[in-house]
């Protein structure tokens, strides 16, 4: 069944040249222009990569702190004990705990955006892996959320860090801010994640690595980016 789009979406699509790859600054300007949401919509960049995600060494996963943040205040929880718990509290973590935090999550509480854990807590955190995993909340060394440096982890999470990973089709989708952001700040954020994705190119990849890049707002149509302008 063909999905029907509303008149606002159709009008937005009409302003996008389907076969054109826009320079970064032009693409950002257009995405802001054609957004029709009645709220401050998120802006997302999507990279289509030439990777075989069936191979473990071609699965990308990591984190990057965007220079201008994401426009979202994140709630951060930290699994830690003793001095590391005090350190996390001092760093500004919203909730810090150990077995008590595990029990709270077992009870159904998942009202947070980022979970950080010290390595010694991972055995306990594993007890709630089935709750955290599907939500993308499971602490992981690759994203800097399993660490003894809880101060940095909390600071990064609060300061605009985003995580990225390839889906099964080789796509990497990352939020880079909001429509209300100045064009230059959105462009800087997009360049930052682009540099990170390019540096993460798996050694086994042959030929063209980045096949396509686009940006869009929450409900708006995608605008294709000229990769050479990133």
Swiss-Prot record:
Domain of life from the UniProt record: Bacteria
Keyword terms, alphabetized: Repressor, Ribonucleoprotein, Ribosomal protein, RNA-binding, rRNA-binding, Translation regulation, tRNA-binding
One record GO biological process: translation
Pfam families, alphabetized: Ribosomal_L1
InterPro entries per record: Ribosom_uL1_bac-type (IPR005878), Ribosomal_uL1 (IPR002143), Ribosomal_uL1-like (IPR023674), Ribosomal_uL1/biogenesis (IPR028364), Ribosomal_uL1_3-a/b-sand (IPR016095), Ribosomal_uL1_CS (IPR023673)
Annotated Gene3D superfamilies: 3.30.190.20, 3.40.50.790
Disulfide bonds: none
Function noted in UniProt: Binds directly to 23S rRNA. The L1 stalk is quite mobile in the ribosome, and is involved in E site tRNA release.
Subunit note: Part of the 50S ribosomal subunit.
Family named by the database record: Belongs to the universal ribosomal protein uL1 family.
Protein name (record): Large ribosomal subunit protein uL1
């Amino acid at each position: 069944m063909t999905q029907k789009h509303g008149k606002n979406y159709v009008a937005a699509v009409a302003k996008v040249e389907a076969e054109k790859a826009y320079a970064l600054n032009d693409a950002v300007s257009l995405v802001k222009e054609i957004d029709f949401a009645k709220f401050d919509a998120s802006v997302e960049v999507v990279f289509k990569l030439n990777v075989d995600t069936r191979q473990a060494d071609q699965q990308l996963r990591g984190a990057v702190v965007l220079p201008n943040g994401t426009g979202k205040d994140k709630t951060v929880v930290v699994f830690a004990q003793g001095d590391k718990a005090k350190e996390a509290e001092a760093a500004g973590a919203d909730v810090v705990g150990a077995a008590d935090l595990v029990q709270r999550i077992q009870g159904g509480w998942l009202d947070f955006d980022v979970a950080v854990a010290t390595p010694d807590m991972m055995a306990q955190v594993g007890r709630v892996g089935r709750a955290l995993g599907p939500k993308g909340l499971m602490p992981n060394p690759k994203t800097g959320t399993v660490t003894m440096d809880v101060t940095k982890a909390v600071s990064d999470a609060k300061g605009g860090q985003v995580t990225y990973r390839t889906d099964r089709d080789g796509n990497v989708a990352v939020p880079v801010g909001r429509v209300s952001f100045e064009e230059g700040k959105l462009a800087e954020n997009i360049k930052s994640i682009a540099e990170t994705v390019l540096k993460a190119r798996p050694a086994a990849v042959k030929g063209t690595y980045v096949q396509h890049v686009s940006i869009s707002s929450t409900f708006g149509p995608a605008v294709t980016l000229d990769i050479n302008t990133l």
